[in-house]
Amino acid sequence: MARIEQVERDKLTARQQTLYDDIMRTRPRGKLSGPFSVWIHRPDIAEPANRLANCFRVSPKLDKRLIELIVLLVCRDATAQYAWSAHFNLAREAGLNGEIIEAIRARRRPEFGRDDERIVYDLVTELLASKKVSSATYGRAEAALGRDGIIEAVTCAGFYAMIGLVLNTFEIPPQPGGDVLT
């Protein structure tokens, strides 16, 4: 059970209702969930978080497959159950190979058939492990993704790390029937 009350739209202030509607425009689920069910209590946090989320959900520069790879790596690192359950199928729909997803779940290095996935994996796992990136890893990432791609990849990883902290602190459970980490 979550540590924070899940509020219904009709119980929100006018500002929160407007924000709720804006958030729901880009999400397929019928009710506010995940970190936004926490952030809705603080519209000053929810508004910029929603704008940043849309950079990755609605108009990413990187291929959505790579965005979802980043998200799953961060979710696994944080054992963020809700985010994993929300992104497991999104990753498959974006074209991420199921064997890669299962390797991430098992905390094993996947076998990659695509260089861009291997490079993103190396960038993000190194960043998560050491909180910085070596010159060699940065150079490979810059050659493959470009400057803007690295900015997006690292910002996405940081955003989902923040989401993992919020989800875990407020014990937001996985989506009903969603895939879970063990």
Stretch-by-stretch model annotation:
Residues 1-182:
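Hydrophobic alpha-helical segments
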